[in-house]
Amino acid sequence: MTHDNKLQVEAIKRGTVIDHIPAQVGFKLLTLFKLTETDQRITIGLNLPSGEMGRKDLIKIENTFLTDEQVNQLSLYAPQATVNRIDDYEVVGKSRPSLPDRIDSVLVCPNSNCISHAEPVSSSFAVKKRADDIALKCKYCEKEFSHYVVLAN
């Protein structure tokens, strides 16, 4: 919100708002999570002012609700995100992502020799470490990577 309390991104009647996305990450989330594969209206705010983050991105998707699995998979990209469920223009539910044990169908294995690049299989990574440096282990090639390497891929 600005100082004069006007919304910078239009309110939605029903759907999901993903707030507190780090700046420059919003488009990556839209692509990786295939959020644009819908006929519902999507509103995106990029580089919005944020008191706690400096700048942030925001995604609003009408008439669409994320599953708990989808919310938790956001944790690699936007660990401080808030996912709000909206009904009749009111927040009726609020959640924050927590790191899941497994991340499926979102990431791409950085190992160019991995079978997941040549076969029609969905990617699958086990989350191996939960400290500041998260390691992800590919289900197919069984190689372990820092999450930064996988995210940059």
UniProtKB/Swiss-Prot annotation:
**Keywords noted in UniProt:** Metal-binding, Pyrimidine biosynthesis, Zinc
| Requisite cofactors | Zn(2+)
Gene Ontology CC annotation, any one: aspartate carbamoyltransferase complex
Domain of life according to the entry: Bacteria
Which Gene3D superfamilies does the annotation name?
Aspartate carbamoyltransferase regulatory subunit, C-terminal domain, Aspartate carbamoyltransferase regulatory subunit, N-terminal domain
Binding-site positions, Zn(2+): C109, C114, C138, C141
State the free-text cofactor note.
Answer: Binds 1 zinc ion per subunit.
GO terms of biological process kind: 'de novo' pyrimidine nucleobase biosynthetic process; pyrimidine nucleotide biosynthetic process
One example GO MF annotation: metal ion binding
Q: Which family does it belong to?
A: Belongs to the PyrI family.
Q: What does this protein do?
A: Involved in allosteric regulation of aspartate carbamoyltransferase.
HAMAP family per the UniProt record, alphabetical: Asp_carb_tr_reg
Q: What is this protein called?
A: Aspartate carbamoyltransferase regulatory chain
Gene encoding the protein: pyrI
